[in-house]
């Protein structure tokens, strides 16, 4: 489920690159405008289709029978929400910024990976252009790294869910992406084409993954649906703001090598990995402290979230997604 939130980022790079090449080869003078119009129209159509088809909740899911709806409700009260389909309260939602004290750390991690993510998704063609190929081949060469990135996105997301762990998964993958930026900053990729192109694969392998894992991480530790709604919208928005930073480091003044841009992306990526590990270690420490205080051995998921209405203030609360 979490992987579906970001797979579009990878696949969009594949489709748009192929679309641009096809239109350009068709000798259309406004190929850029056509590509953007077609991509935008497809996005709007799918969004409208989702609005019409997708149910508002599991209870309204027309494709589930009564038994399946009951199972869905059980899973949500067991592992997701303190109260399912609760009435929206703006005061309750805003209180998240006062009571959920870890949100600034989530935000900082989002800042760090956001610069890397938007640099890859927006400027990968400029990076690959350093290999020395023409426009058409450069666009085609962006397809393979994005496909590999999509595959790793699915695999790592499933792994993260299977092990119920977020911290190490985020840190490892963003580190891989950062190493790719270090390679690009340290070598002349027009003279070392294979190494440079491999570094582009490293960017896509690790660059897209932190986004869905981070969103899942703070949602896993926010059982109140009102607080979850406001935190999700706020943290996603603040992470997306980092697109402004990426657009101001990949500039004509730093072309064609973009060495400083690569160094900045790598630095923020490594910082995000350190913050992710720090948060993971804190959750491990706090869970162990709570177990010692109670003389029990509990982990996240042992206590139904329906019984944890006070969140981390509850004595039996255990953080989910930290280092095991």
Where are these regions (language model features)?
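Cytoplasmic membrane-interface "Motif A"-like loop-to-helix N-cap segments
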Residues: 161-175, 193, 226
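Cytoplasmic loop-to-transmembrane helix junctions
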Residues: 31, 137, 227-234
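Extracytoplasmic gate region of multi-pass secondary transporters
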Residues: 91-158, 211, 215-216, 229, ...
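Paired intracellular helix-loop junctions of major facilitator superfamily
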Residues: 23-24, 28, 189, 217-229, ...
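C-terminal ends and interior cores of transmembrane alpha-helices
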Residues: 172-189
